[in-house]
Amino acid sequence: MNHTFKGYLIEFFIVFIGIAASFFIDAAVKKNEKVQLKNVLLEEFLLKVEEDIEQLQNIQEILARCKDSSDILIDDFYNQTLSEDNLANEYLYLSQNMGISFYPQNGLYEQLLESGKIELIVSSELRILLSTIYEHYEDRNSALTRTLDDFFLTSFTNVANDIIVFSQSSSENQIIYSGTRVKTYDISSSYYTSRDIPAFYSESQNLIRFYADLMDNYAKGFKELKLLIKEELRFQS
């Protein structure tokens, strides 16, 4: 009887170990599948980051040109260094391009979050950077964009009595948001005595600087993000 009991006990342990091993193997396989899917998403992420970097570089170039225009227009207001044609050109570029916005592609980040795959990322540095770029920077981006929109609604109305520039499409300039040129303009005789004009240029300059600083942060973040994603893929390849 004792011998029979021991036999049953051994069989029980064998079956138990088999079931436990089966569960362990199944869990390991499922985790491996999730890791592989996470890696696929990260590989796609790299492609999207490259596209965003290209878009970002265009925006940074435009913002730098807007900063130059605001400097030129402020200097002209106090020193009258520009012809009316050049004044109209600089004003048109500034007014049509300073409101440019950057929209990073965040669909894959949302997918990582919603699927729980982000928790499978080994590098805590990578997880933190993803949150910084696609949440913290995005919040700042949205806030600055709203500020720019509000600024446009009020400021252009304020300066409309002093300067109006009409534009038309230009095939010569293919940069985003800037493919227009002056068609005609109306600059009032009170332009150089207006208080609204320098206030408009000064605030434009400040907002351009704030947005350019944020774009610099994005650029640094994307550069680091590429490196960290590649390290993650090498670690779990």
Listing of model-derived features with the role each one plays in the protein:
Residues 1-2, 6, 27-237:
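Long, hydrophobic alpha-helical segments that serve as membrane-spanning/inserting helices
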